[in-house]
């Protein structure tokens, strides 16, 4: 009898086994979380996202973007400080009073007046070594910005080439930028050995104006 009971547990034991299995399943998988926990978990999800995706208007990428671009990144058109190029003089070598040649510091413009090979029938382009050098020869303590308001060019030709004879300085205005109303340089090029009757004249011209006190 006893051995028969242990061999066949009976219907009572068979009915208890599913109940124990259900209890084990309940303890292993607690089921869906409460609504409050779901809300808190979903509410905290945006806080864990990167700051750029939380709010586009307040993202660091928008806040750190510069409202004004640097001069080096922008082009000369946007920066407003584009280096001015020296305009060519008329073919006859006489400039108009309204034409001005402006140059700033050496960092902005490499040469205030570029040099060129001068011919009688072509336009004349005067050059100098740099704005700081030109302003240093004129006066001490003057800003390196050099503005040429008007140039008076007098030329004569020796053989096939043009010789720059004189460039006269008449008025000098001492301001933060040195303004030359009209500049005249009296340079005798054959004296320096730079001019030959049979060769074209090409030289890096350096302006050496007259002293201010002597005018």
Swiss-Prot record:
Which superkingdom heads the taxonomic lineage of this protein's source? Eukaryota
Instruction: Please give the InterPro entries that the UniProt record associates with this protein.
Output: DUF4705
Annotated Low complexity bias: 27-47
Where is region (Disordered) located? 25-48
- Any single Pfam family the record assigns to this protein: DUF4705
Q: What is this protein called?
A: Putative uncharacterized protein FLJ46235
